Each structure stands twice: as C-alpha cells, then as structure tokens.
Swiss-Prot record:
Keyword NADP: yes
Source species of the chain: Shigella sonnei
Annotated keywords: Gluconate utilization, NADP, Oxidoreductase, Pentose shunt
Residues in coiled coil: none
Protein name: 6-phosphogluconate dehydrogenase, decarboxylating
UniProt enzyme class: oxidoreductase
Amino acid sequence: AVMGRNLALNIESRGYTVSIFNRSREKTEEVIAENPGKKLVPYYTVKEFVESLETPRRILLMVKAGAGTDAAIDSLKPYLDKGDIIIDGGNTFFQDTIRRNRELSAEGFNFIGTGVSGGEEGALKGPSIMPGGQKEAYELVAPILTKIAAVAEDGEPCVTYIGADGAGHYVKMVHNGIEYGDMQLIAEAYSLLKGGLNLSNEELAQTFTEWNNGELSSYLIDITKDIFTKKDEDGNYLVDVILDEAANKGTGKWTSQSALDLGEPLSLITESVFARYISSLKDQRVAASKVLSGPQAQSAGDKAEFIEKVRRALYLGKIVSYAQGFSQLRAASEEYNWDLNYGEIAKIFRAGCIIRAQFLQKITDAYAENPQIANLLLAPYFKQIADDYQQALRDVVAYAVQNGIPVPTFAAAVAYYDSYRAAVLPANLIQAQRDYFGAHTYKRI
C-alpha cells in the first residue's frame, strides 16, 4: 500500500491528475486526507475508477504478487477496452508475467510487467524502473515513467525499455539477487574486521566512510556506515542488539532457481541466499556452538594492511557477483528471446535503486566497448582489478578459513574466479564415472 501511495504521489507531483482505488475504502480515504490539495481523485468502485481514465487507459497495479495480482486484473477486465494498458509494478515472478502478458494480449489488452526498485522513498522521490512488455505499449507510458524515475548524475532517467513479456521483472529479480550478494559480502567484511581486528563501531563507521569515498562508493556502503553508529533509546549500538537472523522474501531464491534452470553457475548470489537460511537456524547454531570445535580467531595483524585487504576482497567479490548476474541475464535473454541491452540495464541501476553504485558506470562502459563480451571479468577494467586484487581476496579467504570465520561469498568468489580461468577442470573424471555406472558416454579430447 505504501509503494502504491508513494508512486501515485510521485506521478501527481509531475503534473498529472491521478485516479486512485483501493479495495479498502478506508485506505483510499486515508491517502486523500493525508494529502490535501493534491490532484488525487478517489474512486470506490472498480467500474468508476476505470471509467474515469482517458483511453488508452494506463493503470498501475501495486498489489502483493501472486494470486492478488490475478484477482486485481480479473476485476479490471470487464471495464477495459482493447488497447488499454495494465502496468504491474509488484515484485512478480517473471514466469507469471509471461503468462499474464500472453493471456491479456489474446484479449486485446496490453500488459507491462515492471520492476520497481528503491523502496518506499524511491517510489516517492524517483525509483529505478524496469518495464517489459509490448514495445508500442511501453511508448504510451514512457513519458510518465521517464518523469517519475530517478535521475543519474549525468541527467539520464533511470528507466529504459527492457524487452518483451517478462523481461522487466526478470531483470528486477536478478537485481534483487545481486542485492543479496552485495549485502552478504558487506556482512562478511564486517565480520572479518570485527573478528580479525576487533574494530569498534566507531572505527567500522570510519572505515566504511573512507570506503564510500572510493571504488566501493554505493548506497549500501553509505547506509552501512550510518548503521554502525546508530544507538537505541538505552544508548546501546543498535546493530549489536539486533538478532542475527536475516529474513528474505524469496526473490533471491527465484534468481538461484532460474540459474539452475538455465545452467548458470550463480554461485556467489546463491551462497548469499543460503547464508540467510543458515542464519535463521539460530537455535541449532547456538546448540552446535557448544558441541562442534574449531579455531578461535587470532589477530589479523597490521590494522591498516588488513583493512585494505578486506576492501580489495570486497570490491573484487562484488565484481564477481555482478559478472555472474550479468552472465545469467545473457543466458536468459537467449532463452526467452529478449534481446537485452546489458549496458542500458547497468545504466538504470545508477540511481534510485538499492544496488546503485559508482562502479555500475564501469559495466556500462564495458558493454559499450564490447556488447558481445561473454563475461565482465574479461573486460579490461575488471581484468585489471582482478590482477591487482586477487591476492588480497585469497589472503582474506585463507585467513578466514584458518580462523574459523565463515565467508561463504568471499570463498565463492575465489572458487568461481579460479574455475572460470581454468582451461582444464577435473570434470573429465566425473564424466568417466558417469559413463562407468550409467553408460552416459563421453567426448575425447
């Protein structure tokens, strides 16, 4: 409800009159009461709401993904005319969007599945917007979406036509997977700095402030520096009294499931999903901590040197994560015939969304230089970073393993990097085993 309200207010603030409807009359009245003088027009029946709109009608749905979306569409259909446009801005599974697009197209309606990132504040002030569906329908809503989208530093709005049917929601799903990876990598960096150097919250905030002024400059690093020094009403550091169980809404899982369907090695992002799952086994972990032995963390040595190693490891880990995510976008684009523009996708992530970061421009540049590049690690800038920073990543992972500090995504980054650069892997033995017990055959060199 908050996302829908904020998007309505955003659209209204750009000079539009907005018809609004909610199943709950009270919620509609509440929005009107809280926003006097705004060009928001309330309606209390679907029929009146639809009839209030100019044709072709442009209807933005912001409802809980799943059955709720189908129910909302079904309630609208009796009052729609051919050519009307429904925009689904929810966190919808892309296969559902493909299905709805197909069904509504057959009835003469247009359906635009649209990823919206930036949370409640982004919805109000300018989100990153990822629309997918019929190109001609997108052209009819583009003027509105362009006006309400976040604006990057170079003045470009953070919205672009992504591709047919489920492309927009697919890109949003991968965006969310990348977000999982970013957050877990940052959490592991925090764990290493606390476990290896015993940094105070003030020192952690200072470290992240410095990081945010360099290559790692991003929304997530920026908010993390603030989180470290936030105190509760009792004067305790808030982060230190938050239970170590990370919840999830399932979008990271969808990204990993799609990777399995496509045969894409999305290891880092998948480890970040699993890290949330194991965090939720709090009772088991507490019990296991009293039974299972392991090393106690020893000092990581020189403070400045280790902080810099962790910074480098974090940046290279982030690059590996995005390389995996964009490789998956390429595989999905081929599978679903979307013709995705990867440079443009990186561009619209530069503002408004949760993963906004300075280095996204480097991704856009890499695809501008070579649109067909198979993997971002092969682009000159990222190859150079890998050359310069891989030793730090290896050192940090080795330290973590020796000292019993779990770093699933840092470790996944090293494993993927070494696997990807290996001309020969031991898979020949696996294939021989498969042939031995199952007559699966093999290819000779």
